[in-house]
C-alpha cells in the first residue's frame, strides 16, 4: 500500500488512532485526525509523534472528511456511524496498516492471529510465551496492548524485529481489515458479546470474527464451538482442539486429565500453573498455533508449564477457611463466566452484574443449578440477571456494592467452595474499568482476614 503523499483521515484519537497517526506520518502520508469528543485524549502526544497533523475535534461534519483518500478507523468507532456509513472512500483498520507494513518492511516474519469472545488475551500472551520459550522471538500485540503498529514501530526503532507477531484481534478491529493473511489464525469461540454493535445479531458478530481467516494460512478451530467450526473451508489446512479425545493425529484433545496431540500425551493439566478446563482449551489452541508455523510441540511443554496466566483472569486471590477466592473480573460476558463456573471443579458462590450489554443471561441458570452455591448481584443489570435465574434454587440476593457481595457470599460458602468474581458484564456502570472492579473484590477479600 503506497502511503506517501496520501491524504489520510484517522478517526479516533485513542491508543489505536494515535498509533495510526504516528505510522502514517512516518510513511509520508498527510495526516488529519478527527475525534467526536470536544477534548479527546492524546492531543499533546499527537503533535509529538505526527508533527503538523491536523486535529478536528467535536461532532463530525461533511468537511471533516473532505479530500481524504481513505479513512483509518479506530476500533471504537462503529462503521455504522452515519457520517462514516455515508462515505464512498475506503475504510481500513490499524490492523490492515500493520499487516501491510509487516509484508512490505518485515517480509521474513509471520503473523499469528487470535480472536474469540473469551480467552483471546490469555491465548495471545501464552502463544508468545511458548514461542519465546522455544527460542523463536515473538511479540504479542494488538488488542492485548501495545497496539500492533506501536509494537512494529518500537521493534523497528530498537532493531529487534521478531520472527513472529502474535496479534490479539477484536471483532471491531477485524471489521475494516481486508488483507490480514496470517500464517495461522483461530476463532477460539463465539458467544454473546457486543451485540449492541451488531444489531443484536450473533451471526453478524461471528461473521466479523471470521475475517481473521483471510488468506491461506492454517485454521485452528474449536471442536466444542459450532461457530468456530463453521469456518472450516475446503482446500485449507485445518487443525482442531477441544475438551475431548483428538479425532486425528494432527488435532489436540483432552482426556484422562491431560492434553494430547492425536494419540500422544503431551502434559497433565495438574502440571500447569494455569487453572480451569477453559485454560486447557486455551493451551491447546496456543500449541496448535505454534505448531502451525513449524514449531515442534515437544519444545513448548516446559514453557507451557511455567506460564501462570494473566491478572484478573481466573486468578486466585486468597484461600480463607477452606474457601478459594478467585478474581475473574475480565469475565465480561456470559460465555466467559460459563467457562469460569464450569472450569472451577467445585461449587461457586459468584458475584454477577454490571452493564450487561444486552446479553441473554439465561444460559447461566443451568450452570448455576449444577455448580452454584449462592449468587450475589450488583450493578445496573442486577435485576435482569436475577429474573433470568429465577427458579434455579440457588440463593440469590441483590446487594449494593462489592464489599457487601463478598461478605454475604463468604457467609454462604462452605469449605471446598470458591467465591468467584466473574460478573458476565462490563464494569463501567460502577467502576473505572475491570481492573478497578477487581481491586474492589480483592480489598473486600482482604477485609475478611481482619
Swiss-Prot record:
It holds the Pfam family Mur_ligase_M. Pathway: Cell wall biogenesis; peptidoglycan biosynthesis. It is an enzyme of class 6 (ligase). Its EC number is 6.3.2.9. Its main location: cytoplasm. ATP binds at residues 116-122. Disulfide bonds: none annotated. InterPro entries: Mur-like_cat_sf (IPR036565), Mur_ligase_C (IPR004101), Mur_ligase_C_dom_sf (IPR036615), Mur_ligase_cen (IPR013221), MurD (IPR005762). Keywords: ATP-binding, Cell cycle, Cell division, Cell shape, Cell wall biogenesis/degradation, Cytoplasm, Ligase, Nucleotide-binding, Peptidoglycan synthesis. It catalyses: UDP-N-acetyl-alpha-D-muramoyl-L-alanine + D-glutamate + ATP = UDP-N-acetyl-alpha-D-muramoyl-L-alanyl-D-glutamate + ADP + phosphate + H(+). It is found in: Cytoplasm. One of its GO terms (biological process) is cell wall organization. GO terms for cellular component: cytoplasm. GO terms for molecular function: ATP binding; UDP-N-acetylmuramoylalanine-D-glutamate ligase activity. NCBIfam families: murD. PANTHER family: UDP-N-ACETYLMURAMOYLALANINE--D-GLUTAMATE LIGASE. Belongs to the MurCDEF family. Cell wall formation. Catalyzes the addition of glutamate to the nucleotide precursor UDP-N-acetylmuramoyl-L-alanine (UMA). This is UDP-N-acetylmuramoylalanine--D-glutamate ligase.
